[in-house]
Amino acid sequence: MAVIKAVSSKAGIGQALDYVTKEEKTEDKLVSGLHCEPDTVKDEMQATKELWGKTGGRTYKHFVQSYHEDEHITPEQAHKNAVELAKNTEAWKGHEVLIATHIDRGHIHSHFIVNSVNYENGHKLQWSKADLQNLKDRCNEQSRQQGLHIPEKGKTFSGEEREETVAWNKETYNLLKQAEKGEVKSYVQDTALAVMDCRETATSREDFIDQ
C-alpha cells in the first residue's frame, strides 16, 4: 500500500535537499534527478531561480510516496515507481525534480523536491487539489498493476475495518454517523481517518508530523 502526501515545511530548499540525500537514509543508486543532476541539484535549482529573477517566495514543493512496512516491495522498485510518477506528472513539466528513496526506517518511502520555478519559461509551479488527487490516483494504479495493496478509506492495511471514530458530544456524533452513510461530508471524520492513515505508515514522531 502506497500513499502520497504533500509535506509542509519551513526549511529552505538547500536544507530540504540536504535532508533527503543524506547517505544514511538512502543509497547513491536510489537518488535520481528529473531535468537535473543529483550531484549539482542545489546549484542548478538556484541558477534557474536567478535566471528568471524569482529567488523569493515559495522555493519548492515537497511530496512523499510512502509504502506500508508490510508491503512486499524492494527499494529499487519503489524508486523506479517514484521516478515514473515524477516523469508523468504534467504540472511538473519543465521543473527540476529530485527523487530520493529512503530505506533507513521501517517502511520504504520516496521524497520529491520540486523546484518552484520552471526552467523553460520562468513560471512558478501551479499545484491544485486536482493535481494532488491525480498523483494519488496514478500511485494507486501503480500498486494495482504490481499486485500491491490499494488504500481503502476506513480500512487498515490488512483490510480490516478501523475502529469507530468517537465523538464527545451528541451533535458531533450524529454528524459523524451521517458522514459514515455518505449523507454529508465531515471534515472531522476526514481528519480522523487521515490521522489513522498516518498511524499505519509512520514509524516515528517526526515521520507522523511530516505526513
Regions of interest found by a model, annotated:
Residues M1-Q211:
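N-terminal nicking endonuclease/strand-transfer module with a His-rich metal-binding environment
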